Amino acid sequence: FLWTFRKNEKDVINLYNTMSPVMQLATGGSMLNFGYWSSKHVDPISAQDNLCDVFGNLSELSTAKNAIDVGSGLSAPSKLWRDSFPDLNLYDVNINFKQLCFSKHQKNIEFLNSTSTKLPFNDNSVDRVLALESAQHFKPLSDFIVESKRVLIKSGFLVIAIPITVNDSSIGKLGLLKFTWSSEHYSLDYLKNLITSNGFKIIDEMLIGSDVYDPLANYYVENRKTLSRTILEYYPGYMEKILYKSLLKMKKASQEKIIDYVLLKCILNNKSK
């Protein structure tokens, strides 16, 4: 588990190759995000789909032609967007080749094994760059933002959904995020400054942490007996205990305003060079 505390891309790949199946078992689906929970979205799959829907609508995918999903995971979000917006061409960029192979051939989705900081696209060639709960792993994040600026057309959007810290917080307070945030722990102010100083203007911001972390932890606690039985069929007991304790710490960190979750919609700042 040394790679859960280190920060290079190979370690992030190892992390997701190990933890992704646990998340799939716990949720019963192929989404790898925390979900956006509500009174109408009370289970993981529904909450995860809801986050993708909200993110897709924020990104105005209904009017988009070409969108890059950077750090696309198992491509479940892209499949949802493809089905919702049949005229949209999606390009799933993932440094993790094993994850790219999971989905096999898909209509209107092209899979590209590449890094987030060197996007394999021409200048001014796409109208959306999407990073749904993945940008926390991009190193350096500033290079991804610069690359997004390069490949976007003038009217394009960069849209990011990302866990953030609210105040300075030690890794010991982050719970599950010690494992899912294998890269930097960005504060909201730092993230916004990084985006605006690299040629973008933020035009929409949604802070949704209380509808992400708290209900996710509550769901696991309420259904732990069934979920742990499923997980223990494939993994040792300590894995389930780490997950359980981390979820509780994550909920506490959210309630204490140590962590939050933000969606940011950005356009190119025409005044920047």
Report the location of each language-model feature.
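Conserved alpha-helix/loop element of class I SAM-dependent methyltransferases that forms part
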Residues: 45-63
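Conserved catalytic loop of SAM-dependent methyltransferase domains
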Residues: 204-231
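Class I SAM-dependent methyltransferase SAM/SAH-binding core
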Residues: 68-118
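A short acidic, Gly/Pro-enriched loop at the edge of an enzyme's catalytic core
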Residues: 117-128
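A short glycine-rich, Lys/Arg-flanked "PGG" loop and its adjoining helix->strand segment in the class I
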Residues: 142-157
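Short, glycine-/aromatic-enriched active-site segment of Class I SAM-dependent methyltransferases
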Residues: 163-183
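N-terminal auxiliary segments of SAM/dcSAM-dependent transferases
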Residues: 1-25
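Short alpha-helix
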Residues: 183-199
